[in-house]
């Protein structure tokens, strides 16, 4: 698909990086109105740099399809080409290539489409969204090469959620703003997030924060998912990139999920275009500030004293008898929708800091490090 798209449109360029555990390289598709002739020049471009990751869990394929539609529509529409003339949009078509090649129709039995998809684990059965900082896999090493080649201002990682049931077809999981820290974190929390929600509302797309509940129902309140550096957005945050994971809802129709992922990505592009100067200035200052610091936060915990109220649209949940286990299971009654104020805890406090050393000493045998 992307080979044909690049052959037909000079704005699309294809690149390969490193190798994944499958033996295949990791691919990168780049949109730039003027084309890309030297990939190493991207990281210093004055344009907005956006990196999109798809298929880290290949059964969660919404972003794979949405990205194909999105890039096709941009290059085939002169008004969109003009609109995003100041953006470089970089797409990893499928990050987990080994898992994508392991195709089936039964490992996500509770998901409403597509008919066939890849497997969650990679060629060595690693969950790649737990491997970014430790880099046990070749995939994560290739990702790091792509990431530092692009140096994205904004990073998007597309997923599908397995969890509670509610009315939304899509949720957002922004990187935790206290961890991002400083003025850049405040910008993410108080400007980028609410503006994206407004953009999507104008498109009739209802969105809410990722519903981070386990063994209970959302109306009891829930905290923001904490994306440590083992996760994609936790890793990219280490380099002052504004990151978010997209989590569509597995029970909603596949077409709806793909369309809303598509609309969210366009909304991110629009916000980035409109706030380009501010984003680049904040990232530059954040990098300078961290070099001047004497300490660095390592551990965080949710602040239960601070919360905001979400106008949450869910379904009534109850415990019913399970026909499989003879015990009880949680059941959401889609015939009983509700709209309630729900407490959402998205403030985190630092619980441990370290003094930043001048250097780390590694013995020669630790070549993997």
PLM segments and residue spans:
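Short secondary-structure junctions
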Residues: 10-16, 207-209, 369
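Active-site/substrate-binding loop(s) of hydrolase catalytic cores
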Residues: 44-53, 61-219, 224-230
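Hard-cation-handling environments
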Residues: 213-369
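Active-site-proximal beta-strand/loop segments in catalytic clefts of secreted hydrolases
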Residues: 17-19, 31-33, 54-56, 92-96, ...
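Soluble metallo-hydrolase cores and metallopeptidase-like ectodomains found primarily
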Residues: 2-52
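Short, solvent-exposed loop/turn elements at domain surfaces
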Residues: 37-39, 60-61, 101, 255, ...
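Conserved beta-strand scaffold positions in the cores of enzyme catalytic domains, especially
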Residues: 14, 28, 91, 125, ...
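Structural signal for hydrophobic packing residues in well-ordered secondary-structure cores
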Residues: 6, 75-78, 147, 200-204, ...
């Amino acid at each position: 698909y992307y080979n044909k798209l690049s052959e037909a449109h000079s704005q699309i360029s294809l690149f390969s990086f490193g190798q994944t555990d499958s033996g295949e390289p990791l691919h990168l598709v780049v949109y730039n109105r003027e084309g890309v002739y030297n990939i190493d020049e991207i990281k210093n471009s004055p344009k907005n740099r956006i990196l999109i990751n798809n298929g880290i869990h290949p059964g969660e394929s919404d972003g794979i399809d949405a990205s194909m539609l999105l890039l096709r529509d941009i290059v085939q529409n002169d008004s969109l080409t003009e609109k995003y003339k100041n953006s470089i949009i970089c797409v990893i078509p499928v990050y987990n290539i080994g898992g994508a090649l392991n195709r089936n129709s039964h490992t996500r039995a509770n998901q409403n489409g597509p008919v066939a998809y890849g497997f969650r684990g990679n060629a060595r059965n690693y969950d790649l969204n737990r491997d970014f900082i430790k880099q046990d896999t070749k995939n994560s090493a290739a990702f790091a090469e792509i990431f530092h080649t692009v140096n994205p201002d904004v990073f998007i990682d597309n997923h599908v959620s397995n969890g509670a049931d509610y009315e939304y077809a899509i949720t957002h999981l922004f990187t935790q703003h206290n961890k991002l820290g400083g003025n850049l974190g405040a910008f993410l929390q108080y400007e980028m997030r609410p503006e994206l929600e407004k953009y999507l509302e104008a498109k009739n797309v209802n969105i809410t924060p990722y519903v981070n509940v386990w063994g209970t129902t959302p109306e009891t309140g829930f905290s923001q998912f904490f994306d440590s550096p083992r996760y994609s957005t936790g890793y990219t945050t280490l380099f002052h990139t504004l990151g978010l994971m997209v989590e569509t809802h597995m029970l909603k129709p596949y077409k709806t999920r793909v369309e809303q992922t598509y609309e969210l990505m366009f909304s991110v592009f629009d916000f980035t275009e409109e706030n380009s100067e501010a984003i680049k200035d904040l990232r530059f200052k954040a990098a300078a500030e961290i070099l001047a610091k004497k300490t660095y936060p390592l551990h965080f915990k949710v602040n239960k004293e601070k919360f905001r109220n979400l106008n949450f649209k869910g379904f009534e949940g109850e415990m019913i008898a399970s026909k499989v286990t003879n015990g009880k299971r949680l059941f959401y009654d889609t015939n009983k929708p509700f709209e309630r104020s729900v407490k959402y805890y998205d403030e985190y406090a630092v619980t441990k800091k370290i003094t930043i050393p001048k250097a780390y000493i590694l013995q020669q045998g630790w070549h993997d490090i």
